[in-house]
A protein has these predicted regions:
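Conserved active-site tyrosine of GNAT-family acetyltransferases
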Residues: 142-144
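Acetyl-CoA-dependent GNAT
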Residues: 16, 20-27, 31-94
Length: 160
């Protein structure tokens, strides 16, 4: 087998079903959120309750069960910024999480690509997010190099 065929084969192995979450799977999303909180990989992350997820657009990845999710909501920009026009409708990604056993398999990228397609269908022209990850180098590589997002700003701190 040559390299390209192997890579294609690996990619096919990790194709998951991505669809809008149903009410029956909300408890599993909350379980994944609790798992994320226990990882302590983000500053100040607090696990979600089902109430936290009301009025959110949620896509989930399935491999027999829910293994990853992305959610957020549509926002309207109140004032002009350097990258967002006043009154522009955009999508704010609030969370993207992949179960640790399924990471580095392209599932997060599949979720982002699926979300982008859905947002384009709705006529939105921009999606954005903030991140509080402790592994900022890896997350910047993912969002900028793999997903094609642009860097806008950063907030840094130093405890004294």
């Amino acid at each position: 087998m040559n390299y390209h065929i192997i890579k294609l084969y690996e990619r096919l192995l990790y194709m998951v079903i991505i669809k809008e979450i149903n009410q029956f799977d909300m408890h599993r999303l909350v379980e994944l959120s609790l798992m994320w909180e226990k990882e302590d990989s983000c500053y100040g992350y607090r696990a979600n309750t089902e109430d936290d997820l009301r009025d959110r657009y949620i896509l989930a990845a399935y491999d027999d069960e829910l293994i990853a999710y992305i959610f957020g909501k549509e926002e309207i920009q109140e004032k002009q910024t350097s990258v967002i026009d006043k009154n522009m409708h955009y999508f704010e990604i609030e969370e993207l999480y992949v179960h640790p056993s399924y990471r580095s398999r392209g599932i997060g990228k599949q979720l982002m690509e699926s979300l982008e397609k859905e947002l384009k269908k709705k006529g939105l022209e921009m999606m954005m997010l903030n991140t509080a990850t402790k592994n900022w180098k890896a997350i910047m590589h993912f969002y900028i190099d793999e997903i094609g997002m642009n860097f806008w700003s950063a907030k840094l701190y130093k405890r004294l």
